[in-house]
Amino acid sequence: MMFEYTQRAFETQYSIIKDILTNDKNPNVYPIAYILGGQPGAGKSNIQRWLKQKDKNIIAINADDFRVYHPLFFDIQAKYGKDSPKYTQPFINKITERLIDELSDKKYNLIIEGTLRTAEVPLKSCLNLKQKGYSVELNIIRIFL
């Protein structure tokens, strides 16, 4: 692929993201995870903001927020413009999966935001988090027309 990056570049970007997210946050004995799913524009971000106001010790994981950390983001953006997300998707998927895995191992409270395109990913996440001792809430937000 034209926009390949090194593992070292990935690790550097991952460390930056993880440090930003965990700054001033602490693990919990009884952690909670909120999984938010819905169409773009359904209001997931509003619920996320409300949850963060309610609990300041919570980390929000939203894959779209990590696009700009792609080591070649600006090159991809310059070449593909509005089509650039499909070229950054593998990177943000890898970042997101690792963050969920590592931060849940350490028992941080989490908000995991996504579109829930399939039932498989959120169900797998719920099971994994439950096995790690989490209380899990699945919230599906829908737009009514």
Where are these regions (language model features)?
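N-terminal pre-Walker A segment at the start of P-loop NTPase domains
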Residues: 1-25
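Phosphate-binding P-loop
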Residues: 24-31, 103-104
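Short hydrophobic/aromatic beta-strand immediately N-terminal to the Walker A/P-loop
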Residues: 34-35
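The conserved Walker
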Residues: 39-40
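Conserved glycine(s) of the Walker
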Residues: 43
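Hydrophobic positions on the alpha1 helix immediately C-terminal to the Walker A/P-loop
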Residues: 47
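Conserved nucleotide-sensing/catalytic segment adjacent to the nucleotide-binding pocket
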Residues: 58-128
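Conserved phosphate-donor/acceptor-positioning beta-strand/loop module used by diverse small-molecule
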Residues: 130-145
